[in-house]
C-alpha cells in the first residue's frame, strides 16, 4: 500500500465483499451465461431481483433479454434514472431502444415476452419482491407461472423479510 501511495495514487476504492470466504465463486462471464440460460429455459414471466448499483449484472439481464426476445420492465426506485444515466455515460448498452418498456405497457405483451427487473429502494430488491408477493407493489403482483430470479446476495439487514 505504501508503494502505491508513493506512485501517486490518492485513493483506493475496492469491493471486498466476502473477501475472507474460501468458497469459490463463478466468473462474471459464467454468471452471465447462467442468467441467459435460465431466462431462455423459462416459458413464463420472469421477475429478476438485482442491486441497482451493479451495472454489470443489469447489463447481463439486458443481454439475456435481447438474446431471448424479451422486453425489460424497470420497476425499482430510481432505476430508470440510473439506467438512462449509465447508457448516456456508455456504462450500459441496449441492443435496441425497444428492449425497455414502461410498467404501464406490460399488458401489451405476453408473459413469456417479459422480464421485470426489480431493484427496490436504495438498491435493495428483496423488499420490492416482498411487496409483489403480498399485492402491495405499485406495478406487479407475483402470480402462478412467474419465475422469481434473485441475481444478487440479499443484504443481511433484510434477512427477516
Task: Give residue ranges: language-model regions.
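Metallo-beta-lactamase
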Residues: 1-24, 148
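Short, small-residue-enriched loops and turns at beta-alpha junctions
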Residues: 19-23, 124, 155-157
Amino acid at each position: 500500500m505504501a508503494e502505491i501511495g508513493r506512485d501517486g495514487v490518492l485513493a483506493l476504492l475496492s469491493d471486498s465483499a466476502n473477501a475472507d470466504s474460501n468458497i469459490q465463486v463463478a466468473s462474471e462471464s459464467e454468471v452471465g451465461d447462467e442468467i441467459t440460460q435460465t431466462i431462455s429455459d423459462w416459458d413464463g414471466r420472469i421477475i429478476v431481483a438485482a442491486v441497482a448499483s451493479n451495472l454489470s449484472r443489469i447489463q447481463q439481464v439486458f443481454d439475456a433479454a435481447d438474446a431471448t426476445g424479451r422486453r425489460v420492465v424497470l420497476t425499482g426506485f430510481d432505476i430508470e434514472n440510473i439506467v438512462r444515466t449509465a447508457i448516456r455515460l456508455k456504462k450500459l448498452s441496449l441492443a435496441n431502444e425497444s428492449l425497455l418498456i414502461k410498467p404501464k405497457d406490460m399488458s401489451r405483451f405476453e408473459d413469456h415476452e417479459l422480464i421485470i427487473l426489480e431493484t427496490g429502494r436504495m438498491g435493495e430488491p428483496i423488499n420490492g419482491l416482498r411487496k409483489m408477493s403480498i399485492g402491495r407493489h405499485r406495478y406487479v403482483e407475483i402470480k402462478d407461472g412467474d419465475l422469481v430470479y434473485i441475481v444478487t446476495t440479499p443484504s443481511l439487514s433484510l434477512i427477516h423479510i
